């Protein structure tokens, strides 16, 4: 938070009237944050982001539930709480490769484009083994100068990692579980062949 406050101060966003909201050149640091109407989880995340950003940084964020049709009209110019999750790095390719910029499939609505990131993502996708691809996926995130992570250009701000909770019958061993991505297939049973009764 200290770094964010420092950046805001350096760029001229200050609370000069004492109302808790930063302003610059007479404009309040205020905007809408959309989420899909009817999605209580994303609504809760949006409200939490708005409350914490106001309390800690001086943002005035209005949370707004919108329809999919409204989202398509506004997603290229206004922030939106989205939900992503995958156990495949292909999601990174879809989110950050310039070939996906501006499509209405929800992957790259911010029109993120970077020749360097494209180069790394293409090298990762063309690697002969998953192990060979790791270097390129990581460099796409941060290569020491640029990338898609918070150290770099951060076209996406990732706020939450969901934790999954399962009840398992006594005596059932479900083996070593991999990371369970948000809303993606059935990761719980991906290792079903390893399950056993004890």
Name every feature range the model reports, one short phrase each.
Residues 14-86, 164:
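Ligand/substrate-recognition segments at binding pockets and active sites
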Residues 3-4, 41-50, 72-198:
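Detector for C-terminal structural segments
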